[in-house]
Regions:
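Short glycine-aspartate micro-motif
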Residues: 16-20, 88, 92-97
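A short glycine/serine-rich beta->alpha loop
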Residues: 27-31, 58-65, 119-122, 191-195, ...
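Catalytic phosphate/nucleotide-handling subdomain of diverse soluble enzymes
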Residues: 96, 108-113, 134, 206-298
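A contiguous, well-structured pocket-lining segment that forms one wall/lid of small-molecule binding clefts
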Residues: 141-222, 234-247
Length: 307
């Protein structure tokens, strides 16, 4: 991590004041209030000789939250700063992150938050890339299904898919923080590489589409903007669009990658934790009752100046 930071600083000549360091989550159990990320914030600060904010999730867990998702406040920032200049107020703007797990943020206007008329709502809604990636890694030399190529070759086993959908009832309602260990790929055991990928991708898409249907605003036109690696999986994105559970009005103009609105989707997550680090420094909330389930809006993160 330190080498990566040093390389970026050397290449960009950025004068860094503060680094938000999340690390790699290796275990997360919201019910037991346990979360563990790889990465030593103290050592990183020492090596790069900069202030570091790390351990973002613990304070939320201590205050009754589930420790995730933490990015909604940043999703709300970019929705207000960039998206709502192009979209009129008749739109309900939702941001979906399809990473290992999929989560959704219903954004609101800042002035409505300030006046306490509305709150940001967010939650984990479904698996994201985790099932597809695990299957591909276990059954091939590839690490993931680039562009959904393998899934597009395969044929979905509808019987297995329907049984899996009955067995994995995620929501609605959507209350629990999800971890990749909440799911497994055993239900596609015995299928070919391609058929397994196709079945898992359609399973993921149907779970996501159920959530989109649940969270659509009945009083406004809904737009869903997608970030995270899953947006690059063409098969997955098309499967969400053609899903029988999908919002009827959903199409290729209102279910789109965030790049369509000038936002770099590969860096939303990293930018989010930079923003959370600043909010932590200012002791501003990073999690909220309607995003993580915490008892009250709380800040989070530990700042270290270890040099």
């Amino acid at each position: 991590h330190a080498n990566a930071v040093k390389e970026i600083l050397n290449n960009t000549k950025i004068d860094l004041d503060l680094l938000g360091f999340h690390g790699q989550t290796i275990f997360h159990d919201s019910k037991k209030k346990i979360t563990k990320q790889l990465g030593d914030g103290k050592l990183l600060s020492q090596l790069i000789k900069k202030k570091v904010v790390y351990d973002f999730r613990q304070n939320d867990l201590k205050n009754g939250g589930q420790g995730a998702p933490l990015t909604p406040i940043f999703h709300n920032l970019i929705a207000n700063k960039y998206l709502k200049k192009e979209l009129d107020k008749s739109y309900s703007v939702n941001i979906i992150n399809i990473g290992g797990i999929s989560n959704l943020t219903k954004t609101v206007e800042w002035d409505k938050i300030d006046k306490k008329k509305e709150v940001i709502k967010a939650c984990d809604i479904a698996p994201g890339n985790c099932l597809i990636d695990e299957w591909v890694r276990k059954n091939s030399k590839k690490r993931y299904d680039a562009n959904g190529t393998l899934a597009s070759i395969g044929n979905t086993d509808r019987l297995i898919l329907n049984q899996a959908l009955e067995n994995f009832n995620i929501g609605p309602p959507y209350k629990d923080s999800l971890d990749i260990k909440d799911f497994d790929i055993s239900f596609v055991k015995g299928l070919s590489l391609e058929d397994g990928v196709s079945t898992l991708a359609d399973f993921t898409a149907l779970q996501i589409s159920r959530a989109l249907n649940y969270f659509k605003d009945p009083t406004k036109k809904s737009i869903f903007l997608v970030c995270g690696g899953g947006r690059k999986n063409k098969y997955l994105m098309n499967s969400i669009l053609r899903s029988v559970d999908t919002v009827k009005e959903l199409n290729e103009t209102n279910f789109v990658p965030v790049e369509d609105y000038g936002i770099e989707g590969d860096f939303v997550e990293s930018q989010a934790f930079g923003y959370l680090a600043i909010r932590s420094l200012l002791n501003l909330p990073i999690s909220f009752p309607d995003t993580t389930g915490c008892n009250d809006s709380v800040s989070g993160g530990v700042m270290i100046n270890n040099f």
